[in-house]
Amino acid sequence: MTSTRYEGDTWDLASSVGVTATMVAAARAMATRADNPLINDPFAEPLVKAVGVDLLSRLAGGELDPAELNDVHDGAAGSAGAMSRMADNMAVRTKFFDEFFLNATKAGIAQVVILASGLDARAYRLAWPAGTVVYEVDQPQVIDFKTTALAQLGAAPTAERRVVAVDLRDDWPAALRAAGFDPTRPTAWSAEGLLGYLPPEAQDRLLDTITELSAPGSRLATESAPNPAPGEEEKLKERMQAISQRWRAHGFDLDMAGLVYFGERNEAAPYLAGHGWRLNSVTIRDLFAANGLDPLDDDDTRMGEMLYTWGIYE
């Protein structure tokens, strides 16, 4: 399985960055099966199994206990990077973005853009108000696979779904407009699980472009990790490599450290605040507490400091 990034790289849902979307869907499937689930994504498990990555299919279907993928750094309760907390992590993240979209559309926004949509099935599972148009933007192979798989499941969108099959490194605003997007109307944007897979300068360009395409009253939700303190970056890489090694023992060969872009970058919240967005932010620890979940252990990934941000463009 190819992991190392290079300029112009592409992927499907079983390779490189694409397989992280399948991992996320596996976690949503696990969260949906929880005793007191915070989310309900009935499409997550069948989509993961349709992709066909064995380890992720077993996690999604409950045949493999994610605790078997923990390592000695994860602590008794589990740190944010522990596989045993994977379902909890994805439950609070998914609920955060679900509620963001439902609140935005309840406030009258009828135009939604999901960037790097992956195996996101919100266009099929959320109770969208009548007249809502949901644009899904992702690589052509990803869009085509999900559309076909959901059709084979007999699923029907609960909003008007428009697909924009384009790489975010290409002229995606033109493709979005060609699909009917109207930049003069307020939009609800999500950049979920995306920013860390962009080089720092590309992250800024993406946020700038969202701002340029946003009419006043538009809303945006995203999440971002803090910049590592001096000396922490190598520890983080080592931790990610250790996690990848545990996966390899179960037949899943993916180097997570090779997929993300390290280095100093503008943190999303202050950057957006400086470009006309009025923002609110919470940490993932706040979301765990608000949803009655056991607190996360500390570890050297700083995942517990992940910041979830939403705001309105003024």
UniProtKB/Swiss-Prot annotation:
Organism: Mycobacterium avium (strain 104)
Binding sites annotated in the UniProt record for S-adenosyl-L-methionine: D138, D167, L168
Record's keyword terms, sorted: Methyltransferase, S-adenosyl-L-methionine, Transferase
EC numbers for this chain: 2.1.1.-
Annotated family: Belongs to the UPF0677 family.
GO molecular function: methyltransferase activity
Annotated InterPro entries: Ppm1/Ppm2/Tcmp (IPR007213), SAM-dependent_MTases_sf (IPR029063), SAM_mthyl_Trfase_ML2640-like (IPR011610)
One GO term (biological process): methylation
Role: Exhibits S-adenosyl-L-methionine-dependent methyltransferase activity.
Lineage of origin: Bacteria, Bacillati, Actinomycetota, Actinomycetes, Mycobacteriales
Protein name, per record: Putative S-adenosyl-L-methionine-dependent methyltransferase MAV_4441
One Pfam family, short name: LCM
Membrane-spanning ranges: none
